[in-house]
């Protein structure tokens, strides 16, 4: 077996295969998961001209939005952790959109200090746990806890980098969103779209996807159950993710 073939097999044991790209995540604290896939499939991208992914991790969201957006759209991904940012660079380089994605290994505060508001869409699957029980590695604590990237800092940096008519999209647990939304409103954000997600159609929502705007408009609310009453993937979930999941 060639070194290249062996390398590809190793990647496929340590990552996630989508229809058009592969995400290796063995060097990332947070692996590919449903939250990120939902956000990447849902975020409104039709009028995007330039996209920013904050806390990119493996580069999943940047890759999903590259697949969904027009060929002229440029995507920047910012990731503080050096191992994760390197893996995001490798994932992007191996994808069909290598010339459209740029990965920056730095924190969002430093990144935003050097740039102007020229992003039409900003997306983030942010840390949302307050500091608590040790995770076993500093890398995982950084990805899970709001110690280094608080929601206030995230909102402030996104506000600084977003074009006036742009959207800032995040995914959060329902309980966290109850505190995040009032904080966002204090920073002059308005919820333009909200998708509440439940594991099953007869269960309460456990995640919320938000599209925030600097413009005040009436909020449009949606519901999505991942599985139906028979515990099969729901039609809505399949429709949303069919361009990505291999067997949808």
UniProtKB/Swiss-Prot annotation:
GO terms for molecular function: nucleic acid binding; tRNA (adenine-N6)-methyltransferase activity. GO terms for biological process: methylation; tRNA processing. InterPro entries: DNA_methylase_N6_adenine_CS (IPR002052), SAM-dependent_MTases_sf (IPR029063), Small_mtfrase_dom (IPR007848), tRNA_Adenine-N(6)_MTase (IPR050210), tRNA_adenine-N6_MeTrfase (IPR022882). Keywords: Cytoplasm, Methyltransferase, S-adenosyl-L-methionine, Transferase, tRNA processing. It comes from the Bacteria. One of its GO terms (cellular component) is cytoplasm. Its EC number is 2.1.1.223. The keyword S-adenosyl-L-methionine applies. It is found in: Cytoplasm. Belongs to the methyltransferase superfamily. tRNA (adenine-N(6)-)-methyltransferase family. PANTHER family: TRNA1(VAL) (ADENINE(37)-N6)-METHYLTRANSFERASE. HAMAP family: tRNA_methyltr_YfiC. Specifically methylates the adenine in position 37 of tRNA(1)(Val) (anticodon cmo5UAC). This is tRNA1(Val) (adenine(37)-N6)-methyltransferase.
């Amino acid at each position: 077996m060639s070194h290249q073939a062996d390398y590809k097999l190793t990647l496929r044991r340590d990552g996630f295969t989508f229809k058009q790209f592969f995400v290796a995540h063995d060097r990332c604290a947070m692996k590919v998961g449903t939250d990120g896939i939902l956000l990447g499939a849902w975020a409104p991208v039709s009028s995007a001209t330039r996209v920013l992914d904050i806390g990119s991790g493996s580069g999943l969201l940047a890759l999903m939005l590259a697949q969904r957006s027009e060929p002229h759209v440029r995507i920047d991904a910012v990731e503080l952790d050096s191992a994760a940012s390197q893996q995001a660079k490798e994932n992007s380089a191996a994808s069909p959109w290598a010339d459209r994605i740029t990965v920056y290994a730095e924190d969002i505060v430093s990144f935003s200090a050097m740039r102007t508001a020229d992003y039409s869409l900003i997306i983030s699957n942010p840390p949302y746990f307050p500091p608590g029980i040790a995770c076993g590695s500093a890398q995982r604590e950084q990805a899970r806890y709001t110690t280094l990237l608080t929601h206030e800092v995230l909102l402030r940096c996104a506000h600084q980098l977003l074009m006036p008519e742009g959207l800032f999209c995040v995914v959060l647990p329902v309980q966290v969103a109850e505190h995040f939304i009032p904080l966002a409103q204090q920073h002059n954000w308005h919820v333009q779209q909200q998708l509440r997600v439940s594991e099953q159609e007869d269960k309460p929502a456990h995640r919320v996807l938000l599209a925030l705007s600097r413009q005040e408009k009436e909020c449009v609310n949606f519901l999505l159950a991942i599985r139906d009453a028979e515990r099969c993937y729901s039609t809505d979930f399949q429709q949303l993710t069919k361009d990505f999941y291999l067997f949808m």
